[in-house]
C-alpha cells in the first residue's frame, strides 16, 4: 500500500507542478486592463486554502464529527505548542530562502544562478544521509550528479535572457554566489527537517500541514506588508484576481498537500526527481501551447541526462555471487 501511495503521490506531484508552472506563466504574461495580481498575496491565499483543505481532511478522518475535529485540533495543536513551533523552523527558512534567491538573481547572471542553484539536489541528499541515516549507493550518488547537471542544462538561459556579466562587479557576484549557496543549504535542510518531523512523530500529515500553513501565512503576510504594502493599500489585497488567478492559487495550495504526501510516503530526493521531470514536461508543453520557448540542443541534452538519472537512481544491481560447493 505504501509503495502505491509513493508512486501515486509522485505522479500527482509531476502533474501538479507542470500545471502550476504553465498556468502561472500564462497568468503573468496575459495582458489585461487594470493592475496585475500580486504573487505575494497569492502565496498567503494558497496557504489559507491549504489549511482549510487540511481541516476538511481531518474532519473526514474524524468520521465527519465536529466534536471529534475540535478535540483533535485542540489536543494536537493548542495543547502541544512545542510540537507546533517545530514547524516555524522550515516555514521561516522557506521565507528566508525566497529572499536569498531574490538577492542572488539581482547579483548573478542567469546562467551562473541556474547552475549553482542545482546544488540543492546534492545538499538534500547530504542532509538525508546525515539527519535520516539514509544510505545511498554509488549508482544513486552518480544519478544525483547527473540529475544536477541535467537540470542545469534544461534551465540554461537563452542568449536573449543572459545578462552581460561584465556589468556585474566581483563584489556583487560574490554576494550573489553566497546568497544562492546559502539558499541551497537552507532548502536541503528545511526539506529534510520537515521529512524527519513527518516520519518520526505520530501526528498526521494533515495536522502537520495545518501547523506549517499557519506559520507560512504569518511569514507570507509579513512579505505582503514589506514588499507590496503600498500597492495593497492602494488597490486592495485581491487586486487583479480573476478566474485564472484562482486556478493558480488552488494549484499552489494543492502543491503543499502533495509535497507533504510525497515527503511522507517517498522522500525529498525522489521529490527532486519528480520536480525535474515536471520542468522538462512544462517546458515542452510551453513550446507547443504558449509558444514562448524554443528548445535548444542544450535543453535536449539536459532532458536526456534527467531521464537517464531518473532510471539510474532506481537501478538496483543484483550481486552475482557464485554458489558455493559442498
UniProtKB/Swiss-Prot annotation:
Q: Name one GO biological process term.
A: transmembrane transport
- Which cysteines are cross-linked by disulfides? none
Note whether Lipid metabolism occurs among the keywords.
no
Q: Which UniProt keywords apply?
A: Golgi apparatus, Membrane, Sugar transport, Transmembrane, Transmembrane helix, Transport
Pfam entry (one): Nuc_sug_transp
| InterPro entries noted in UniProt | Nuc_sug_transpt
What membrane topology was assigned to this protein in its record? Multi-pass membrane protein
Molecular function terms, GO-annotated: UDP-galactose transmembrane transporter activity
Q: Which family does it belong to?
A: Belongs to the nucleotide-sugar transporter family. SLC35A subfamily.
The task this protein performs is described as: Uridine diphosphate-N-acetylglucosamine (UDP-GlcNAc) transporter in the Golgi apparatus. May supply UDP-GlcNAc as substrate for Golgi-resident glycosyltransferases that generate branching of diantennary oligosaccharides.
Subunit structure comment from the entry: Interacts with SLC35A2; the interaction is reduced in the presence of SLC35A4. Found in a complex with SLC35A2 and SLC35A4.
- Stated name of the protein: UDP-N-acetylglucosamine transporter
Query: Which species is this record about?
Result: Canis lupus familiaris (Dog)
Chain's gene name: SLC35A3
Amino acid at each position: 500500500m505504501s509503495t502505491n501511495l509513493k508512486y501515486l503521490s509522485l505522479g500527482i506531484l509531476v502533474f501538479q507542478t507542470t500545471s502550476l508552472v504553465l498556468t502561472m506563466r500564462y497568468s503573468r504574461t496575459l495582458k489585461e486592463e487594470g493592475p496585475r495580481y500580486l504573487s505575494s498575496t497569492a502565496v498567503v491565499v494558497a496557504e489559507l486554502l491549504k489549511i482549510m483543505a487540511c481541516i476538511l481532511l481531518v474532519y473526514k478522518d474524524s468520521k465527519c464529527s465536529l466534536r471529534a475535529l475540535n478535540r483533535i485540533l485542540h489536543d494536537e495543536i493548542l495543547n502541544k505548542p512545542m510540537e507546533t513551533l517545530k514547524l516555524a523552523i522550515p516555514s521561516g527558512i522557506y521565507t528566508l530562502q525566497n529572499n536569498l534567491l531574490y538577492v542572488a538573481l539581482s547579483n548573478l547572471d542567469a546562467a551562473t544562478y541556474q547552475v549553482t542553484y542545482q546544488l540543492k539536489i546534492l545538499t538534500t541528499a547530504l542532509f538525508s544521509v546525515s539527519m535520516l541515516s539514509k544510505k545511498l549507493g554509488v549508482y544513486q550518488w552518480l544519478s544525483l550528479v547527473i540529475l544536477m547537471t541535467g537540470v542545469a542544462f534544461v534551465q540554461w538561459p537563452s542568449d536573449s535572457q543572459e545578462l552581460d556579466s561584465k556589468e556585474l562587479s566581483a563584489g556583487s557576484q560574490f554576494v550573489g554566489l553566497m546568497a544562492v549557496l546559502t539558499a541551497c543549504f537552507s532548502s536541503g535542510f528545511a526539506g529534510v527537517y520537515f521529512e524527519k518531523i513527518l516520519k518520526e512523530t505520530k501526528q498526521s500529515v494533515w495536522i502537520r500541514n495545518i501547523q506549517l500553513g499557519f506559520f507560512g501565512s504569518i511569514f507570507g503576510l509579513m512579505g505582503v506588508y514589506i514588499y507590496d504594502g503600498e500597492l495593497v493599500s492602494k488597490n486592495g489585497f485581491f487586486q487583479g484576481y480573476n478566474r485564472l488567478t484562482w486556478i493558480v492559487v488552488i494549484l499552489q495550495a494543492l502543491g503543499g498537500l502533495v509535497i507533504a504526501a510525497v515527503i511522507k510516503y517517498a522522500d525529498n530526493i525522489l521529490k527532486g526527481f519528480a520536480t525535474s521531470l515536471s520542468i522538462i514536461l512544462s517546458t515542452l508543453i510551453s513550446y507547443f501551447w504558449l509558444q514562448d520557448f524554443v528548445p535548444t540542443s542544450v535543453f535536449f541534452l539536459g532532458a536526456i541526462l534527467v531521464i537517464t538519472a531518473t532510471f539510474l537512481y532506481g537501478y538496483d544491481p543484483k550481486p552475482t555471487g557464485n554458489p558455493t560447493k559442498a
